[in-house]
Amino acid sequence: MSKEELLQELADAIISCKKDTVLAVVEKAKGELEPSEIIEKGLAAGMNEVGVRFERGKLFLPHVMMAADAMTAGVAALKDLMPEGASGSKLGVIVNGTVEGDVHDIGKAIVSTMLQSAGFEVHDIGRDVPIRNFIEKAKEVNADMIGISALMTTTLQGQKSVIELLKEEGLRDKVKVMVGGAPATQAWADKIGADCYAENATEAVAKAKELLA
């Protein structure tokens, strides 16, 4: 089986919520592919497709949750191959969440997984997160960066609010801020004073490494 076929089989298993198949294919892929490639082009690719189908009303929340569970199991099976920081990082500590009023979770969850697999210590605080919770968690874990996702134009302002509260708390110089999500852009990131904008999970990893090097 070619690498492309392995990755496609993995993506299909995620879409079908077949956890046992995911684990079996991950084991096969371990000897041929890097963990980051297995996650990005296999597991995350499948989860992205689940997200697309969910947004179009073709899949429902229980299916999404089962697919996410299968992806989590796949990532856990790769833990022994991940960089030494993946479970207690020295690359940097990142708090990642989706702002209050926004219940979208899939894209943010994929970003968290990719960052963790790259060697960051990631604290995923979920979706629909109150602004202050981002700051409190950052203080608690001594975060180097906060990732703020917003998937709706109506919740985009929450990204700006997190940055403003960081300033009020005297933490802005210490904590980097990355923004992302469908309505976010580089221009928006510049406008609100974020340190960077990431269009996707792969870019998020690259930007985080660049900022926290």
From Swiss-Prot:
One of its GO terms (molecular function) is cobalt ion binding. It holds the Pfam family B12-binding_2. It comes from the Archaea. One of its GO terms (biological process) is tetrahydrofolate metabolic process. Coiled coil: none annotated. One of its GO terms (cellular component) is cytosol. Gene3D superfamilies: Cobalamin-binding domain (3.40.50.280), Methionine synthase domain (1.10.1240.10). Pathway: One-carbon metabolism; methanogenesis from dimethylamine. Methylcob(III)alamin binds at H104. Keywords: Cobalt, Metal-binding, Methanogenesis, Repeat. InterPro entries: Cbl-bd_cap, Cobalamin-bd, Cobalamin-bd_sf, Corrinoid_p, Dimeth_corrin_MtbC, Met_Synthase/Corrinoid, Meth_synthase_dom. Residues 1-90 form the B12-binding N-terminal domain. Acts as a methyl group carrier between MtbB1 and MtbA. Binds 1 corrinoid cofactor per protein, is subsequently demethylated by MtbA. Copurifies with MtbA. This is Dimethylamine corrinoid protein.
